[in-house]
């Protein structure tokens, strides 16, 4: 009341201004009237309540008086009733009815009638009068903190293992898996060395023949430069080792080396375990398979760790290989030629002359060397003049073409007659080297020129047939020496040596090819080795390959790919006219069976080619294996190294001062971890731990410094890398980590390499679901689907045993490297395969049926226990026929607090059709040939898993938001899928409509109806209230939004959705991804002054329009995982052309300028405009960052002429947005900029090609090949997916051999398919059906062709069986007889088919069927699968 007295005093004359007195009087009257009005309203309400209670009490008294009068009347009329009594049954009836009346009153409180109903009606009326509304709050999502294991590392001690044995076990793990007896034998050779501070562990000129493991203390490893200075490479701490794997190969191959530049000195008192490398040689004599596996692991480490780190991240290519090696004299390798041969016409442009003197020929003939029985016919056509005019290729200009490409190059193994790429000499001659005739082949060799004519060593125009036995003998002798074989072993390699003469620029093998791997030996000429350019800064300018080194005569190449079993890391081409001798991969493996030690010589050949830099790096680089939960480094530790993720997944967690832990990011395969902290020399800011079993390469800081001093290009590479990372962090900094932001708002990489698929119940159609997801992923890139049956077929039935751990993990790692994503389909039980899937998965998809119970099963809880740190996402399936929308999603999420994200997937009818496994494979073999629907939920899920999601951001702007509907229609017509939607203000409304309906017609209709309601002014007038907080109460506005959406939660939307609001309680923005949809849409549309802030149901914070802080939240969408974003801005444009009025401003002057028509108008903002500009200051800054970002396509339709409240022009504004959007996307398509949004559109259907098959490129275990380890299934690599690839299901589904097909068909003859059949049987029967069709279609061709084709297939099949190892002996000894019978039966079958030359393909199949029926009837003839 002090204010009222002050105003009354001012009205009485304290102020002399008329205007002030009038204003004060008016205000005092209004306040007085308001107080009186509210007082009168309260008094009238109290009087009404008192009158109502009085009336109710009087009615009750009148009723009681009437009952009393009735009783008295009955008493008077009946006389004295004291002698009367009730019968027992009447008493029971009376008390029973009385009890029922009581119970009815109690139960009636649950309904809208009964006791208390009138009281509730009065309370509702009073609440409506006093604005005391209490809504029924819906079910809220329970916020459960992740378990401690999710953000904390595992700290477990190994008390049962002594420290020295534990450190040694961890150190020699880089050599592969050792069995316990082998490990114990190695431990016997260990020695303990005690060093004081300053003592040398080893120094220059000491023999490099030991592995050193630090048990305690610290050792400094440094290199000595030529000027006498030293540079530290790394500091070896407790548990780490000092060794060079390249020196390990030198010692085992009999060429021990010495330390030339590397020295190790103790920093403090230390105890070091010394393990001589000779101890391994003793073990390898008794276990040759262990030696071969160790050499293979070393070569794999060399290729994956050294080359990956130095090439991809430091930009070193040619610096890794010695280009100037010792030139070897190979005078007898070119063979005898005619004395009249013109040297000038046969001399290569850059190679040595291909001429051998007659003296060398006579000397070789007298010495008796040669290969008897081998004759070579060599012819040569006239060479073209252009061949001699070709430019010389040097290191400075390696490319023959002016544009830097190799357009004119040809492949050595391409067919000489025609251009068919699938028919090549390499694969044609594979059929000539089958297992049966490799050891006995003594055929004549014809040197063919690439143009299809015979090659000759004479003058052009002269064709002569000469004896080339000396050339063959010289090639055999040279390759024998390179492989470390004695002269007595010449007969072993002699049948496998082949000769070729190459024209310039003939490609022997391309980078990434695993089919044409050979060991090539250069006899004359030169080979050039290239590698693709990995420099990201030059990728758009220089597409040519980079020259690495030359291979001169007397040198060998191809050993690295041969030993690793992986694809070739280089492209090899002939630089000039070159003659080579080579041995194919299959032949090398057969030689290994007889002489396993050739792997040492092959490895030594690879090591000799490497530069001294690689050997120094080999001392510094470490290969680290981390189990799930183990920490790479911890927060606040010193940063002296960086790490490269080779496989697995890492998680970075920060611990705040209060002890709270938060996820900072996640790293996948190929990411660099800890590089910024190491370069800036700061302590670790986070703790990085392994989410699953991972492999890392550790690069110490000293190695970086040493390489930077020698090769300055590394600095440029690092600057480029850090610049991209810094720019990316700047773009994602805003919006992340804000209060109220979900966990997904952290900069976590949503790109996964391995995905595990787990069914909740047995009712989930897991196989069709995996097929559909596979189909959608094929449109993005190479993908692989693995099941337990597929792995058993490929690697054997005992592959899940502990003894085969190395083989299984290596095979899976290789498959993951070849594909952008690998799908692991788990079993329906907790089997060994399911546990392996959990260990391999980057993310786990828990698949359930959305219309079934949400309860958690026991199997699901076990999965969460096995993989606590792995991210888990829920996938709910809905049948398309039911037309049902997602509901009750919150119950699913509350029951599974470990789920971080959910997906709703609408499934077509074929997914839920109950079919046998065979029919499912048959169905999807046809589905795979079709184009996947890029707008389906499966494609949306596929893009999310691969990090290619497309986000749509709709900005605020009032009635101008109708343009969003037109833009949505234009986006749909342009073929752009929408995977995520976010909106603010009117954009939140339109985006929520699209996520809920996904039909442009329904969305347009609902948006139009809502806009019409906003034009009904009489409803708005009824919503007016006293303007203390806002002009409107918001009741009618809430009703319009609630009628549009209903009681739907954000979790129940088909498409992931978020909206943004301004939290004026905490002075920040809030991102809403769950909760009541209409409430948060209403909050995001609450314009200050017009609508009151909405109270957040979760914590009561006041929420206003999100446009005040971010009117176009494209940055938030990017943080949530969208890779490509379309942002549509419909906000108002502020006028920036304002009048400069000087230092002061008079309102009278503005009023004069406004009303005087003879003066020029001025542009000065008024009070509301200034308040609006102040409110949108942060929004404007955020909008400028979005416009300048590289991940966002900013679009603004021409809708500036429409006002914010022009809701009546809905159709007109929508048409403007549609026309503009259609033209905009058409122009983008013409300019080629639309590809990143619809790059899956109009793409050819995924076709299964031979090179992508599991069988044609898989992990090769040399130890298994050499030692013939037992396998259950012999996989046919030559014929798999060749004939029936168009209807055979997924490319990752290997089938069985033809003999197995026929046998399984016979065993199932006469039986119908059932739902319990396994996938293995189903694939076989499908292949049999397709094989019959293929055989029938070949009847029209000549019988000779059919016989030759079948003979070639059988030879390829036997080659494949030899390649992968034939099962000849069971582990228990019981399988030897069965395996022998199986092999004998296959040979007899092949001989019988070759004898039946007049039979057609159909007759052969029928004959095999009859023979198998007879074998089935006889127990002694059965074969074991």
UniProtKB/Swiss-Prot annotation:
Residues bound to a nucleoside 3',5'-cyclic phosphate 1: 174-301
Motif (GXGXXG): 956-961
Swiss-Prot/TrEMBL catalytic activity: a 1-acyl-sn-glycero-3-phosphocholine + H2O = sn-glycerol 3-phosphocholine + a fatty acid + H(+)
Region (Disordered): 332-410, 1330-1425
Residues reported to bind a nucleoside 3',5'-cyclic phosphate 3: 598-727
Traits of the deletion mutant: Progressive degeneration of the adult nervous system, associated with apoptotic cell death, glial hyperwrapping, and neuronal apoptosis. Also, vacuolization in the neuropil.
EC number: 3.1.1.5
Record function comment: Phospholipase B that deacylates intracellular phosphatidylcholine (PtdCho), generating glycerophosphocholine (GroPtdCho). This deacylation occurs at both sn-2 and sn-1 positions of PtdCho. Its specific chemical modification by certain organophosphorus (OP) compounds leads to distal axonopathy. Plays a role in the signaling mechanism between neurons and glia that regulates glia wrapping during development of the adult brain. Essential for membrane lipid homeostasis and cell survival in both neurons and glia of the adult brain.
Subunit structure: Interacts with Pka-C3; interaction inhibits the catalytic function of Pka-C3 and the esterase activity of sws.
UniProt protein name: Neuropathy target esterase sws
Species per Swiss-Prot/TrEMBL record: Drosophila melanogaster (Fruit fly)
Source species taxonomy: Eukaryota, Metazoa, Ecdysozoa, Arthropoda, Hexapoda
Gene this chain is encoded by: sws
